[in-house]
Structures are given as C-alpha cells and as structure tokens.
Amino acid sequence: MSQFSVLNVGFGNIVLVSKIVSIIHSDSASAKRIRNEAKSNNSLIDATQGKKTRSIIVTDSNHLILSNLRVESLTKRIESRDNSIASEEEDLD
C-alpha cells in the first residue's frame, strides 16, 4: 500500500502535497486577481470556514484553495510533516 503525504490546510481539510504547485500570500494584487479568475472559472475551493484568508494554495490542476493558515505555518507543516491542528490558528469562535 502506498502512502500519500498530505497537508492539513485548516479545519480538517487536507491537500495532497504532491499536487501543490505553490503557496502564496493572499493580500497581494496578483493573488486577488487569480482568486477572482478562479472564482469565475469555478476552480476556487474555500477551506477557511468563514475566517480570514491568509494564504492561497495553487494546485497542479489549476484549482486554488483558500486557507486561514499563514504561508509560514503551511510551509512548516510540509517540512516537518506535522498536520496537527494548532488551536491559536484555528479559533472556532
């Protein structure tokens, strides 16, 4: 049985690490532009549970996944293979 490396992008949502092309900050002008394009193309996936979008994950299928986790946090999770849920980043209030 093969084992897939996954990334918890918040609130129990996961993405296969092998499918990630890049992770970008959500507040840049170019990020907002590609976000709007993805929304109009029906290729936008919102994994924020209504929280502020802090990063955008671009996949090899040209889907964009919105995450409430910071780029740095997602990068650390990939590097350390840690997919635990940090309560300070996922405040459910």
From Swiss-Prot:
Any Pfam family: RemA-like
Family assignment from sequence similarity: Belongs to the RemA family.
Lineage, opening ranks: Bacteria, Pseudomonadati, Spirochaetota, Spirochaetia, Leptospirales
Superkingdom of origin organism: Bacteria
Leader peptide range in chain numbering: none
Organism listed in the record: Leptospira interrogans serogroup Icterohaemorrhagiae serovar Lai (strain 56601)
Identification of the protein by name: Putative regulatory protein LA_2599
